[in-house]
């Protein structure tokens, strides 16, 4: 252990490692000037004490949505303060909070409401929030990151509707606006009409970064993050190229660069080279798979386990075979099974997440079927599944 600490102290790789972390927001965001300006235009009325429009920011993972929102609000809050106007951003991640109750609690606590961990309904938390806001002044801008997770929970759409209509219950001294951030371009289409009509007053779409744009971003951050001369010339272009293949994900590019540096540091090497980037890619993929599998709902985990068990036979499994094995597993656990249609939907979701791969094949006069196989590191999947006490009983 002591040698690990010594190696970290003696390392000459990093200067400011934290500028490569996902939650770091720099003062300059290359290739997002148009999005910064548009969101600033939407929120600028707050400087006059007026309610800004609600906004929805769309885009795939790593396209700069959250960073743009945070940078605009950071500057807006500072400018408002210099004018004697209170603008308070409230950041809540709907996926991390998991339930409408916890989302509502996080918003309420941000304005000084004490909320018990359990014991109240969402409606009661909302009423406490309204009561508290009614006594305040200023503009409160709620940023709901990964907002698409909220309507998937019971009561989530109702909470969204209430938030978008909350100003009708407040006086003219305080205003609330909502900025939603989502990776799902079809998010709004699945909402109830009453929610849809009031949620996305302004919509901003963030395109994926290109490889040259990712290279610009990495070069800017690398100047701050690393000591001079420690990066081989082809490290940044390689990180940019690998991330560009995955829909232009800047977060992925930054992770590759950071982990490559950490691997070089752990190996007590003085330079970061191509092989460190490839090692970083493998390490990140294992971590990504573990995180995705760990957070799957129970029935999705059982479907995934069914696919793995059937794959032991050496060939891809059909949807029908997966469903029969899944029903056996639910029976073993004493659970109600979901429908074949729902299992087919779960398989599509796992495919989209990159955990399995599926393809439709023709079986002649027997028609078409879908063949499914694992598309992620098997050991990483097994380890993540084993952390669930229910699933662990089946391994």
UniProtKB/Swiss-Prot annotation:
One of its GO terms (biological process) is DNA replication. Belongs to the CDC6/cdc18 family. Involved in regulation of DNA replication. Binds DNA. Keywords: ATP-binding, DNA replication, DNA-binding, Nucleotide-binding. The keyword rRNA-binding does not apply. PANTHER family: CELL DIVISION CONTROL PROTEIN 6 HOMOLOG (PTHR10763:SF26), CELL DIVISION CONTROL PROTEIN 6-RELATED (PTHR10763). ATP binds at residues 63-67, 209, 221. Contains an N-terminal AAA+ ATPase domain and a C-terminal winged-helix (WH) domain. Domains are separated by a rigid linker. It comes from Aeropyrum pernix (strain ATCC 700893 / DSM 11879 / JCM 9820 / NBRC 100138 / K1). SUPFAM superfamilies: P-loop containing nucleoside triphosphate hydrolases, Winged helix' DNA-binding domain. Pfam families: AAA_22 (PF13401), Cdc6_C (PF09079), Cdc6_lid (PF22703). The keyword Nucleotide-binding applies. One of its GO terms (molecular function) is DNA binding. InterPro entries: AAA+_ATPase, AAA_22, Cdc6_C, Cdc6_lid, ORC1/CDC6, Orc1/Cdc6_arc, P-loop_NTPase, WH-like_DNA-bd_sf. This is ORC1-type DNA replication protein 1.
